[in-house]
Amino acid sequence: MTVLDFQQVSFIRNQQFLLETINWQVKKNEHWAILGLNGAGKSLLLQLITGTLWPSSGQRTVLGERYGKTSVPDLQRRIGWVSSALQNKFYGRDLAEEIVLSGLYSSIGLYESYDENQLDQAKALLADLGLTHLIHRSYHVLSQGEKQFVMIARAMMAQPEILILDEPCTGLDLFAREELLARLEAFSKLTNTPTILYVTHHTEELLPIFTHLLMLKNGKVHAAGKREAIFTEEVLTTFYDQPILLHPFTGDRIIVTPK
């Protein structure tokens, strides 16, 4: 099954290409990392995936539904999105499990009634991430890393088929980052895990679970495909426009440094 299919997708603003001729396919059972420097077009690409923006040209098919021939709100409910910016929108006194529950309704805060089964589901999602200790704790006392874990559990509450993690380690210290990545790797191995799209510009965050990479550069696809084929010194040197070196990092990860 094709999870995502972009064909000749471009986005123009003020007569300038911000994304140009994007051709990209994601298949079921693939987890992708999207790598790009600031201004490469990563955020625009995500908004085109979720239907928040409309392209200037090209066709987008997501989860078998073609934009323009399907209900955008219905399709958006099948996509989970986690970003650091979302953390600050929630109310500090809400309990962690209440924030997770709000993912059922895509709301900031919990205003709908819920039953015990739904509450148990929220607690189970926290448990899946190894976060049972956060149950009954107020959001405002959580660390930045814990808040990000709660956001991931919230996104999973609606059982999405795609989970977008938009620079989830932003604002985390070294130890919180490593904890988040470890929990994400464990989570990815659970049954019925959605397709994960992980956005970053830090190569050391690229876990082995990411089978494929998309490199965005100046609004264009610089390289896309299986990780082992494109995560090389040769490709990365042209991506960064300067010589680089690859160094082994913890957990079978690799860090890139200037040569």
Please provide the spans of the model-predicted regions:
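Conserved ABC transporter NBD signature motif
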Residues: 58-68, 75
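Conserved ABC ATPase "signature" region
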Residues: 116-134
